[in-house]
């Protein structure tokens, strides 16, 4: 398997040797999907939001594939993390080093984010939920904050 900047939908392409990885044939389908979550998170955070160290970052769906990728990238960048997910995922997310985890089903995440950030709101929010969550995300966005929507699971 290789990584390429272009030709993502091609059946064949040329790739530098240092971007090739041996993958056992029985794992090809799984291996092909691995970069998707991390590249999605990285593109949103670094290229679209230009997230910076010490900014507050709200990750909706922090327990999912893109959410965990965003969490790990944010930790590497020194970003302050707030996440929303189902209550049963809270222990896992806490074990990954996230202090502020909100159960979006039983808590008002907008109020909690404002409380956690001393009323300032999140500097960057990634929202995969859509619907009412998108509206509430705007309500807890810091002045000059950046909100990025992707892969809605509900109609906006």
Sequence positions of predicted segments:
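Terminal helix/beta-alpha structural elements that buttress the NAD(P)+-binding lobe
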Residues: 1-156
């Amino acid at each position: 398997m290789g990584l390429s900047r272009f030709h993502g939908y091609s059946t064949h392409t040329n790739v530098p040797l240092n971007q090739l990885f041996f993958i056992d044939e029985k794992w090809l389908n799984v291996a092909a999907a691995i970069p998707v979550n991390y590249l999605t998170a990285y593109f949103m955070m670094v290229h679209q939001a230009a997230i910076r160290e010490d900014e507050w970052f709200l990750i909706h769906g922090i327990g999912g594939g893109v959410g965990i990728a965003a969490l790990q990238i944010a930790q590497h960048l020194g970003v302050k993390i707030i996440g929303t997910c189902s209550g049963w995922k809270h222990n896992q997310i806490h074990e990954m080093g996230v202090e502020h985890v909100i159960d979006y089903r039983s808590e008002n995440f907008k109020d909690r984010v404002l409380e956690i950030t001393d009323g300032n709101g999140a500097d960057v929010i990634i929202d995969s939920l859509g619907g009412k969550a998108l509206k509430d995300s705007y309500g807890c966005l810091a002045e000059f904050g950046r909100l990025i929507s992707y892969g809605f699971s509900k109609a906006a």
